Amino acid sequence: MAAKKKTQKRGRTVLKPKGKAGAAAIESLRGQIDRVDRDLHDLLNERARLARQVGISKGQQGRLVDFYRPERESQVLRLALERNAAARGKGALRDEEIVRLFREIMSACLAQEEPLKIGFLGPEGTFSQSAVYKHFGHSARALSLASIDEVFHEVEAGHADFGVVPIENSTEGSVNHTLDRFLTSPLQICGEVELRIRQNLMGRMKSLREIKRVCSHPQSLAQCRQWLKEHLPDVELIAESSNAEAARRARDEKGTAAIAGETAAEVYDLSILSADIEDRPDNTTRFLVIGRRT
């Protein structure tokens, strides 16, 4: 039998196969993964087919929003979490990863005919857009709008199926304009999204040494003050109107980095140079999902 090397990993001994036997074991595991992937692919396609049949059986001819049922989505997620709890100790994924995967699966199935249109307070790359994707998945069509008023108006007029608006920040308090808008709007609250505000340093450079200036919204700069002082004490700090505008500058200007959420890195094709640089990890923003009916 091939020799095995002992290594320590987080307090426990792990045996690592060496030589040809080790390479064969890795190939065998990869083959098993490939078979699981094929099964997953077939099951995902079967789920999509069944989801489409549900729509047809309901007489789906009109608006897709009528076939998005938040209560059914909650039931699917609850069952997924129950199964995950039962699988503890057997290599189970974390609950938040399970929720994210199932939301993306449901989003893709729902979008087979036409994606849901979700209005949010823009511009693109903001935390509001991150909240859209967290709740509806990346298959939803996120519509960047200029103001909270416009989000309400687009949903009221039927140009967007749902809207996502900020309602409360754990450090800044309530968003009064959102609260005021409910006084005159017929829209209803259809759901809630709690988003941990993770600030990331991003840019096109390969190392922090290449950074000449850092742009971000004043709140984000303030939330990362200590990290910036420790790691980039000599760079210029520039306040921008939004984190998205800062990310755009980081994309277009050599030597410029931005502080923003992960979605901004995706939208503006930036590399995350350092993740989770906020001084307080407990900062969250709560968003409401608004629609014409529950």
Annotate the PLM regions.
Residues 2-294:
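Domain-level signature for soluble enzymes in the chorismate/prephenate branch of the shikimate pathway
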